[in-house]
Amino acid sequence: MGFRNRILFRWLPWACLIVVIPSVLWRVAMLCGANTGFAETNLYRGSFSGTIYVLTLEVVQLAAASACVYLAYANTIRYGRLPLIIGGIGNLMLYYIVGCFVIILIRYSQGADVWTPMRAMDATQRLWLYIAYGPFLTWPLLLTGALFGYQERRKAEKHEIMTM
């Protein structure tokens, strides 16, 4: 693996963590009382179970993104393919989530009556929603690159051990 690729594959896992932070901040701002324009704000802010749901979502999302960073610095020989298997399953779930989101967005833009968080939002609130969730949509692509980089490093380390 060339020097450029090594640097790229080292930073992709960090990018996986960075792209989830804006959406986490948006949801926390919603819980703290910011006027995000989200139609179901009272459902989450007004009940204990709704608040717990959102906070649990934040913890799970940040934990999964932090696990992506592990791909950059893990002792690859010790765990073998396990990070690839777990990361691959997680990545498939991310592609599914993003795919569903894109389908809903396309249907909404064509005038279909589908649920969307943008129902009660003005233009500024929609802009903030796009800023918060736009980077999130790149997470599966970044994780794919991070998994590929992990596999390449794993192969290189294995080859290095075999040639010693």
Predicted features by range, described:
Residues 51-62, 123-144:
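Hydrophobic alpha-helical transmembrane segments
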Residues 14-20, 81-99, 164:
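Transmembrane alpha-helical segments of multi-pass membrane proteins
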Residues 37-48, 100-130:
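Interfacial non-cytosolic loop connecting adjacent transmembrane helices
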Residues 2-16, 47-53, 76-86, 125-131:
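Membrane-interface helix-boundary signature
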Residues 21-55:
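Hydrophobic transmembrane helix segments
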